[in-house]
Amino acid sequence: MTPTPDAPAAADAATGAGWLARRRGALARVALAPVAQAIGRVERVADGIAFVSGLEDTMLNEVLRFEGGVTGFAHTLDEDLISVVLLDPDAGVRAQTAVARTGAVLEVPAGPQLLGRVVDPLGRPLDGGAPLDAAHTLPIERAAPAIIERDLVSEPLDTGVLIVDALFTIGRGQRELIIGDRATGKTSLAIDAIVNQRHSDVICVYVAIGQRASAVRRVIDAVRRYGAPERCVFVVAPAACAPGLQWIAPFAGFSIAEYFRDRGQHALVVVDDLTKHAATHRELALLTREPPGREAYPGDIFYVHARLLERAAKLSAALGGGSLSALPIAETDAGNLAAYIPTNLISITDGQIVLDSALFAANQRPAVDVGLSVSRVGGKAQHPALRAASGRLRLDYAQFLELEAFTRFGGLTDARLRAQITRGERIRALITQPRFRALRTLDEVVLLKALAAGALDAMSPDLVAPLRERLPAWLDARIAALTPALAPPRDWLADDAALDALAESVGELIERIAADAAHRATAGMPAEDAAGDIGGAFGGEQARGDADRDADHGANREVSREVSPEASREVSREVSREVSHEADRDAAADAARVAGRAPGRAEPDRAAPRAMPDGPPRAQADGDRASASRPRPDARGDAARTAPSPQGGAEVNVNAAANVDAEAEARHKR
């Protein structure tokens, strides 16, 4: 039995009276009252800081909007005034300008739509692209994960740089400081780490603070050319922008990276650099009349950087297992690691990679100081095969550097020490790596195993660079030959026997590289031209010349075998007497020539050139005088070089006479 609808309700629905009544009841329940909005006034403005009064309830870091559309955030809160850091040019902000609260804190857009884009710290595009869809926003100031929310750092973050991956391993979720003097390759090392993530699942965020626009453009172009820009976000606050944007830039970069970390992905943040960020914080603090401390920095500078870098972490499996790694960059002055900001950052981070200006000047790139650099995670996040292969690398290299310092005072006679010096030179050549020449983990393990086995000891250090360039293709070919058809993928790093076999094959590659180098040295041309220019007419002439020289040497060896030792000694005595007489005659001729009485030589007619007209005759006369001033070949010297043998009349090649002739010519020139 179906229920019948209520007649009044049906009538109301038909006429719409019920809907109207309900709407009237809802409107009656709304409390209509005026809403008070506090409006403050600008008391004064200077250097990107506005001092505002009348907004006592403002929160710290709250966004304030000025009349005319300029925005800023509350930096310090005093009883009477609020120091507001402007995020836009202060044009239009004057005294008595109205200021209103927004009730919101600074936020930045986050999400996949930022990948491949260049934005400012507020998410505004700088690459000329379309505006970003702010479907997801995150506050720039977020709390760091608690201890219970973190997990151990146990996965490596491969940088492709051998010295970093082997000696100072960086783990996913680690904070590793890159520190060094100006122009020592700090940014280059960080960009190499970003470029190497093109084959990984890591999202990279590059934050530029106070950098020149041209330098930032070079970084972006390098990532677009060698890396995977579709997996990178560039947050740029150049030196020409407002100090407020430079101050919030690293916080915005971390918030963008945290979006991916919180979803179980892995992210890497490069902050370039925190020294300029500290200078910006000091500038804002001094402008807002905060009391200065050591090196004029405010007392909270340590807390500012600590709360920023503590946001890098490896989350637990319950939270998705994502990670956020940080590579902050800091600049030192004349290598002073004991300065205020460097010591703060070293104590906050999980290790540091120190770049030395002397090593950089010696053309060692990257110029990593092995003695001062450290990773406090290290082997816990290193691949087991790489950890086993690089066990003694740091110790051997440190001992080599110490021995090398002693060799400057004298030679080494101990064979063991000489072998250690040789091994150290190969290690230094191996860890010297050009930019954008990243190595795979397999390449690094095989190289270190070959080094430990002594395969590199016999090769020249100059051949290490060709070995590093040709090794990946060589290993790929070897793996393809060792892998059966339709075989499942194989983890070569987990097979010690396979790694040993690949390391042994490096010896064959070294022999090929050495043979190619010898061939190029013999041909006297670069590698790219040697293959194409040896053949043909030039190659035939060179081959014929080599054959003639070989025939001459063979004939001389045959003559030497035909002459008896007694005949050779007799010829040597005859040649010595002849050379002695020749030397006496040359000395007498030199003395006569100096005195103007050279025998057998007519004095040149010096009046003849004056009678000659200008042109070829004068040039010919000058050429004659020049040829006369050059030493002429001596017939007797030539005869002395080939002396008859008393047994058989064979000719003997005598080198001693040639040496005496050379000494006589040298005396003549003096």
UniProtKB/Swiss-Prot annotation:
Gene3D superfamilies: 2.40.30.20, ATP synthase alpha/beta chain, C-terminal domain, P-loop containing nucleotide triphosphate hydrolases. The keyword NAD does not apply. It is a peripheral membrane protein. It holds the Pfam family ATP-synt_ab_N. Its EC number is 7.1.2.2. GO terms for cellular component: plasma membrane; proton-transporting ATP synthase complex. This is ATP synthase subunit alpha 2. It comes from Burkholderia pseudomallei (strain 668). The lineage of its organism: Bacteria, Pseudomonadati, Pseudomonadota, Betaproteobacteria, Burkholderiales. The gene is atpA2.
